[in-house]
Amino acid sequence: MASKLFVPILDNGTGIIKAQYVYSALTALTGRGIALARFSQPYPTRIMNMATATFLSSDCDEMLIIDCDINFTRADVDKLLSHDVPLVYGLYPKKALPLQWCVATLTDENPFGGDEPLVEVKRAGRGFMRVHRSVFEKMKPLVPEYHNHGRAEWQFWHEGCDNDGEWRSEDWWFCDNWRKLGGKVLVDQTICLQHIGDYSYGATIPNNS
């Protein structure tokens, strides 16, 4: 039986969603029988914890997170959903030149360019990711629980300084907690997306094998 998919529509509290995202979403998600919910909140940690709590209270098995400034295709979504792993990401660059992927690698060596689509990294940006319910269930003992208007929520997404004085964003923090549990942070290097700002930042990875 196919997994039930939850897709939160996230904006940054302004109500503005990039036109490229709307077109991508309509093209890639139409006809899939997914559960959709929109969230509007200016704080990244708040919106992600709200979306995750809604997902966990649903009967869906997996959550597909796509930021509202990502340009993607149906094929990108198909690839992400095809992997039998609990957590997987697509690649997109930061909104800056020269282009840099929104990932932190395990070593200083470039891990990309080989034949295998899945590459393990240390951390990845959450702008295009698929996560199974089991990831959050395993992570609950590591994070605080709180209540919001009578509903239980968990601080899966947090930002701040760690014990080494390094500032970590909410997606970095999430990856670190998953790796503490022995999980792998995997990216599909064949999914190379555009990050929409004043310019559409995008690139592809050449095969070096």
For each predicted feature, which ranges?
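Active-site nucleotide-sugar/metal-binding loop of Leloir-type enzymes
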Residues: 49-62
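Anion (oxyanion) recognition and catalysis
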Residues: 30, 81, 178-179
